[in-house]
From Swiss-Prot:
Protein name: Matrix remodeling-associated protein 8
Described function: Transmembrane protein which can modulate activity of various signaling pathways, probably via binding to integrin ITGAV:ITGB3. Mediates heterophilic cell-cell interactions in vitro. Inhibits osteoclastogenesis downstream of TNFSF11/RANKL and CSF1, where it may function by attenuating signaling via integrin ITGB3 and MAP kinase p38. Plays a role in cartilage formation where it promotes proliferation and maturation of growth plate chondrocytes. Stimulates formation of primary cilia in chondrocytes.
Alphabetical list of SUPFAM superfamilies matching this protein: Immunoglobulin
Main subcellular localisation: membrane
Motif (RGD 1): 128-130
Membrane protein topology class: Single-pass type I membrane protein
PROSITE patterns noted in UniProt: IG_LIKE
Length: 442
């Protein structure tokens, strides 16, 4: 019995050396990029071209713990309808953890699994309860990788029936009851064994291939590194018009933008994504075609516009005027109405003030002339009244003056007064213009 167990163990070790879990591209396969997509883009000249190149696996998430966020776990499912349960798991920077108490010291994983790539599960003594499909699951959270391998375990009572074979989908292992069983899971890719360093692991570059030029002679346009470094190549007329987002590695969007397309920009553009640590090498190809910009044909020149046959016809404004649309915006509230009403009232008030000013100025001018006339008339009137009073006074004093005539005149003044008393009153001068002005001013 012991001899058969040793023979079975040696067979399992031989199977371990031959059964290797397939992984991502490595070695020479990693050097070549896999073509992900190829499309034709046709745009008009003068527009902006956007060549989409996106990949969530290229998002820069620096692993500060240097454990690469890797984990391996083994699961067991008893049959098609049974529920899968977790048996054991182990992180690259931690210890292995067994979930069921009965499986402790029975299920073993190699402590150096993340160094030598051997993630096989050893069961020391199998029993009937261990039958089922075992799944080896590898998860790389940093590189967004998930890989799995299934092994089916069958338990037999006859040690001579112990064997291992391939059923077309997975490995089948037949083990005698109480004998050890080794479920093989090997993956020696550097992404799981940490054989490569992290520096310069992410790089993106854009190439431009002119029509008729082979792929290996394409011109480099841009180089983008996860560290933030950027390098621009290509002809000057194109270098100033191409750009990629500054946060490309934070969003995983490396789309190329070309401003103001020209006919000389036609060609084959390729986006190359390389994540050397995670083994990502992808290529996306775009066939860019630049067409003539769409424009309206010029209208005929009218006969009376004076244009000759050699000059280009000018567009007729009446042709497009019939198809124009005039948008009239009517305010929904009464603010606009009150605003216009305020303008009208303010204008009317200014006009009234101006009219009042003119009337007052005219009245003031006329009142000044009337006062001047009144002053002159007053002086003349005063003189007339004095003369009348003086004449009346002289009449009253006539008897006395008659007596004085007989007397001897003392001086010339008395003589003149006497002559005036005996002489008739002078005619009163009447100024009709002054009288008319007095009546008008009243």
């Amino acid at each position: 019995m012991e001899l058969l167990s040793r023979v079975l163990l040696w067979k399992l070790l031989l199977l371990q050396s031959s059964a290797v879990l397939s992984s991502g591209p490595s070695g020479t396969a990693a050097a070549s990029s896999s073509l992900v997509s190829e499309s034709v883009v046709s745009l008009a000249a003068g527009t902006q071209a956007v060549l989409r190149c996106q990949s969530p696996r290229m998002v820069w998430t620096q692993d500060r713990l240097h454990d690469r966020q890797r984990v391996v776990h083994w699961d067991l499912s008893g049959g098609p309808g049974s529920q899968r349960r977790r048996l054991v798991d182990m992180y690259s920077a931690g210890e292995q953890r067994v979930y069921e108490p009965r499986d402790r010291d029975r299920l073993l994983l190699s402590p150096s699994a993340f160094h030598d790539g051997n993630f096989s599960l050893l069961i020391r003594a199998v029993d009937r309860g261990d039958e089922g499909v075992y799944t080896c699951n590898l998860h790389h959270h940093y590189c967004h990788l998930d890989e799995s391998l299934a092994v089916r375990l069958e338990v037999t009572e006859d040690p001579l029936l112990s064997r291992a074979y391939w059923d077309g989908e997975k490995e089948v292992l037949v083990v005698a009851h109480g004998a050890p069983a080794l479920m093989t899971c090997i993956n020696r890719a550097h992404v799981w064994t940490d054989r490569h360093l992290e520096e310069a692991q992410q790089v993106v570059h854009w190439d431009r291939q002119l029509p008729g030029v082979s792929h290996d002679r394409a011109d480099r346009l841009l180089d983008l590194y996860a560290s933030g470094e950027r390098r621009a190549y290509g002809p000057p007329f194109l270098r100033d018009r191409v750009s990629v987002n500054t946060n490309a590695f934070a969003r995983g969007d490396f789309s190329l933008r070309i401003d103001e397309l020209e006919r000389a920009d036609e060609g084959i553009y390729s986006c190359h994504l390389h994540h050397h640590y995670c083994g990502l090498h992808e290529r996306r190809v775009f066939h860019l075609q630049v067409t003539e910009p769409a424009f309206e044909p010029p209208a005929r020149a009218s006969p009376g516009n004076g244009s000759g046959h050699s000059s280009a016809p000018s567009p007729d404004p009446t042709l497009t005027r019939g198809h124009s649309i005039i948008n009239v915006i009517v305010p929904e509230d009464h603010t606009h109405f009150f605003q216009q009403l305020g303008y009208v009232l303010a204008t009317l008030l200014l006009f009234i003030l101006l009219l009042i000013t003119v009337v007052l100025a005219t009245r003031y001018r006329h009142s000044g002339g009337c006062k001047t006339s009144d002053k002159k008339a007053g002086k003349s009137k005063g003189k007339d009244v004095n003369m009348v009073e003086f004449a009346v006074a002289t009449r009253d004093q006539a008897p006395y003056r008659t007596e004085d005539i007989q007397l001897d005149y003392k001086n010339n003044i008395l003589k003149e007064r006497a002559e005036l008393a005996h002489s008739p009153l002078p005619a009163k001068d009447v100024d009709l213009d002054k009288e008319f002005r007095k009546e008008y001013c009243k």
